[in-house]
Amino acid sequence: MVNGRETLDLTPFAGPPGNVAAWRISDALVDYAEATAFMEARAAAIAAHQAEELVWLLEHPPVYTSGTSGKPEDLRDPRFPFIATGRGGQVTYHGPGQRVAYVMLDLKRRRPDVRAYVAALEETIIRTLDAFNVRGERREDRVGVWVKRPDKGEGHEDKIAAIGVRLKRWVTFHGIAINVEPDLSHFQAIVPCGVTDPRYGVTSLVDLGLPVTMADVDVALRQAFESVFGATRAILPETA
């Protein structure tokens, strides 16, 4: 069966001519609550036409977060802080070695279609992984991007990237998280995104045997993002 999200036309997400989002990378770990407060304020400013769109790349200190569909029982071992958020999705983990990209775009200027926007984020991840010869795939019944793991047995798949979004006045925030080289044992304390089937686990690029760095992923991610959403403009963290 063909996944319906794969057939969506992504071209309109580039927006009108001259629409360029800022591209910011933070090198130091960013506290999750501080990042959320920044996104809330930035999204409001974008909606009011007082700030430009922004893609913010960062890493968090270890933290578990729950989206609007999260269940308390999905947190098995609260070894790190647990924060309830307003994003979509369930319980997940963020930590060092995971590239988080918070995407703050005005969909009124691009395409006011949430379903297509999520598919566009999935496509961005898939194209990023393709740069490292990793085949990422969508699944209709499971959010995020997955890779097949025949080395673990028939039907086994691992999640390599998560997606969780929120919109206010058609401005997006939150975004995606790609596992580059996080401590995968930290996922054992939760039911990642509510998936309990033992055939489905979590992996990372390094876990797949790829000697990639965060900088390598950042280059591929920006190229992939621009191929889906249009041009970006690199800025220094303090100018965002």
UniProtKB/Swiss-Prot annotation:
In its miscellaneous comment, the UniProt entry states: In the reaction, the free carboxyl group of octanoic acid is attached via an amide linkage to the epsilon-amino group of a specific lysine residue of lipoyl domains of lipoate-dependent enzymes.
- Tell me which NCBIfam families the record gives: lipB, PRK14341.1, PRK14345.1
Which Pfam families does this one have? LplA-B_cat
Q: State where it is primarily located.
A: cytoplasm
The record's subcellular locations are: Cytoplasm
Q: Which GO terms describe its cellular component?
A: cytoplasm
Q: Which biological process terms from the Gene Ontology are attached to this UniProt entry? A: protein modification process
BPL/LPL catalytic domain sequence ranges: 49-233
Q: Where is this site: Lowers pKa of active site Cys?
A: 159
Protein family per UniProt: Belongs to the LipB family.
Reported function: Catalyzes the transfer of endogenously produced octanoic acid from octanoyl-acyl-carrier-protein onto the lipoyl domains of lipoate-dependent enzymes. Lipoyl-ACP can also act as a substrate although octanoyl-ACP is likely to be the physiological substrate.
Q: Which GO terms describe its molecular function?
A: lipoyl(octanoyl) transferase activity
Q: Which PANTHER family match?
A: LIPOYLTRANSFERASE 2, MITOCHONDRIAL-RELATED, OCTANOYLTRANSFERASE
Name of this chain's protein: Octanoyltransferase
Which pathway features in its UniProt record?
Protein modification; protein lipoylation via endogenous pathway; protein N(6)-(lipoyl)lysine from octanoyl-[acyl-carrier-protein]: step 1/2
PROSITE patterns (UniProt xref): BPL_LPL_CATALYTIC, LIPB
Active-site residues (renumbered): 193 (acyl-thioester intermediate)
Report keywords, A-Z.
Acyltransferase, Cytoplasm, Transferase
List positions binding substrate.
87-94, 162-164, 175-177
Q: Which reaction does it catalyse?
A: octanoyl-[ACP] + L-lysyl-[protein] = N(6)-octanoyl-L-lysyl-[protein] + holo-[ACP] + H(+)
> What's the Enzyme Commission number for this chain?
2.3.1.181
